[in-house]
Amino acid sequence: SKGIAACPKHFAANSQELRRMANDSVVDERTFREIYTTGFEIAVKEGKAKSIMSSYNEVNGVYANENRHMLQEILVDEWGFDGYVVSDWGGSNDHALGVMNGSHLEMPGTGKSGMRDIVRAVKDGTLPEEVLDQRLDELLNVVFATHQATVDGKGKKFDVEGHHALARKAAEESVVLLKNSNNILPLKPGTKVAVIGDFAKTP
């Protein structure tokens, strides 16, 4: 009703941060169900979550974003999930296989190589076009259900500068000083500070 879709993450067995983009969570089915997916099951069945973010890691030798057992057999077939699966940032390893096995949206985008992989897979028959169409339909169902698109096709206008100002204000007001070594703060008037990096230009 508020135009928002919840997105629980990271599905699933993302149990450590060290080498999480490459590690393999080897886990038996009972442990996987009872420990690693119960929270997601509740979010889908009771919370009606419309989006799930897949994790970087492999689960029993298959990357989560391409894992049919997780994305189709458990998430859709058993739990009745009717939303879309989004990869973690750069978390798609095999673009076509991800689409084939239940992934919908790749972040931050497929890029040229990803698009070429998907087109090639459709042309050689490893990714049926109807599966690609189905993923698009499933994704658009959430877009329309959350009123993120308008019927007249004009789309919504966003106040980029206003949103930027709000984000900056939120960041400024949420800063917490944990340590003040040698009483360096507050800075004395006239003190020079070097701000380096992307956020120096656009805070």
Spans of features found by a protein language model:
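Glycoside hydrolase catalytic-domain context in secreted enzymes
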Residues: 1-203
